[in-house]
Amino acid sequence: MKRIAFVFSTAPHGSASGREGLDALLATSALTEALGVFFISDGVFQLLPGQKPDAVLARDYIATFKLFDLYDIDQCWICAASLRERGLKNVNFVVDATPLEPVALRRELGNYDVILRF
């Protein structure tokens, strides 16, 4: 079975990319357990709690990330450099994601056969 990586690299609510990626991830999790989820660049904002998407007339899909345990999605990484660049430290993200430096993150991403970016 091929290993599939989902890479979230865009900020939430500015486009449908994050929501569509999350939908694809949850659907794919029904077919395979060989999944990895990566949050890089502005994608780290996908995991911030307390967002108010209704202010920009967007759907609140961020809470759906909390379903990862229910879907047995436990391989999650977040780019430590992206967190530093955006001043995000000591934040309780909506998902438990392991911070990795860029080199280690690329190495981990190299273990996947298919990479889908949202």
From Swiss-Prot:
Its main location: cytoplasm. One of its GO terms (cellular component) is cytoplasm. It comes from the Bacteria. Pfam families: DsrE. Gene3D superfamilies: DsrEFH-like (3.40.1260.10). The keyword tRNA processing applies. It is found in: Cytoplasm. Keywords: Cytoplasm, tRNA processing. GO terms for biological process: tRNA processing. InterPro entries: DsrEFH-like (IPR027396), Sulphur_relay_DsrE/F-like (IPR003787), Sulphur_relay_TusC (IPR037450), Sulphur_relay_TusC/DsrF (IPR017462). HAMAP family: Thiourid_synth_C. Part of a sulfur-relay system required for 2-thiolation of 5-methylaminomethyl-2-thiouridine (mnm(5)s(2)U) at tRNA wobble positions. Belongs to the DsrF/TusC family. Heterohexamer, formed by a dimer of trimers. The hexameric TusBCD complex contains 2 copies each of TusB, TusC and TusD. The TusBCD complex interacts with TusE. NCBIfam families: PRK00211.1, sulf_tusC_dsrF. This is Protein TusC. It comes from Salmonella arizonae (strain ATCC BAA-731 / CDC346-86 / RSK2980).
